[in-house]
Amino acid sequence: MQHYGTRGVHGQTVEVLAQRILTGQFAEGATLDITALQSELDVSLTALREAMRVLAAKGLVDARPKRGTFVRPRDDWSLLDPDVLRWQFSRATRPGLFSDLHELRSIVEPGAAGLAAERATGSDVEALDVALAAMASAGDDIGAAVDADLAFHRALLAATHNELLQRMEVLIETGLAERDRMVHGAGPGDPVPSHRAVVDAIRRHDSADAARAMGRLLEQAVEDVARLADENR
């Protein structure tokens, strides 16, 4: 998915305003001075209004007669929107966000791995093997390592042949990408063995072992984040 920041002046305006809202620079309930923002950001009124429409669609702002455009409460935000998720994770705007991600993954992915072991076709296993090979060859290339990890988890969800589980990739991948960039940049251990254990269990159609292997993989992910947090203290 193309980020708004790569979509020209309109997209860059969306990014700037979203980050100010998510970081609290524009507080909940605050009325936005459109004229001042147009001057500060040096954009056309049309581009600014288009950006506001995007943010309104994502629940971040609203416009009312006599009140103007204002920041909506966090409870109104479309927190599962891919862009809103990315903005949150990229700026770590809320403590505990990665913990929430781990809890979600712990609920979804072991079950998904078990289901994949029951339903995976030969092409599903091949896609997992391709992701493993990419992971093994990524080396110190953080971008390649992140892409390979995302491809693995995407292939895992696809192997469940459950459309609703497959849609979870938007939620899981957005946070996983940011976590991977943070952890891989700090030089973690080899991720291939833990991922291969999941694939091998799926290849054997061993549902229980696949779920256990995914659980162990997630435990290692938590340990990696905790280790990095300790190192940065």
Where are these regions (language model features)?
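Conserved donor sugar-nucleotide recognition element shared by glycan-biosynthetic enzymes
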Residues: T6-H10, D149, P191
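Short loop-to-helix capping motifs
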Residues: I34, T160-E163, H205-D206
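All-alpha effector-binding/dimerization core of bacterial HTH-type transcriptional repressors
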Residues: D75-A155, P193-A213
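Amphipathic alpha-helical protein-protein interaction surfaces
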Residues: T121-D124, H161-L165
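Short linear motifs at protein or domain termini
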Residues: M1-I107, G114, E231-R233
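C-terminal all-alpha effector/ligand-binding and dimerization domain
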Residues: L132, A136, R167-R233
